[in-house]
Curated annotation (Swiss-Prot):
It is an enzyme of class 3 (hydrolase). Bidirectionally degrades single-stranded DNA into large acid-insoluble oligonucleotides, which are then degraded further into small acid-soluble oligonucleotides. GO terms for biological process: DNA catabolic process. Residues 1-25 are annotated as: Disordered. The keyword Transcription regulation does not apply. This is Exodeoxyribonuclease 7 small subunit. It holds the Pfam family Exonuc_VII_S. Keywords: Cytoplasm, Exonuclease, Hydrolase, Nuclease. GO terms for cellular component: cytoplasm; exodeoxyribonuclease VII complex. The keyword Hydrolase applies.
Length: 83
């Protein structure tokens, strides 16, 4: 059961590859909206769990974009030091 709860911390489902690419800011905005909705006391358990999974996917994708940006920055810094 606990493994299922943290399953969303892994890579998003394969069908996400077909989805249009979002920017880091768009992922963060989607995550903020999900958090706002999760605070709704009238949200059902099922809807809350679905929303949680979606939010975790948005977080994962935003983190990946941030990680890639950092790696690109590091690469540029290394190139600048050689020049």
């Amino acid at each position: 059961m606990q493994d299922e709860l943290f399953e969303t911390e892994k890579a998003p489902p394969k069908n996400a590859k077909n989805a249009p690419k979002k920017s880091f800011e768009e992922h963060v905005h989607s995550l903020e909206q999900a958090i706002d909705r999760l605070n709704d006391p009238n949200l059902s358990l099922k809807d809350g769990m679905d929303l949680y999974k979606t939010a975790m996917q948005e977080l994962f994708l935003a983190q990946k974009l941030l990680e890639n940006a950092y790696l690109e920055y590091e690469k540029l810094q290394t190139t600048d030091k050689k020049a």
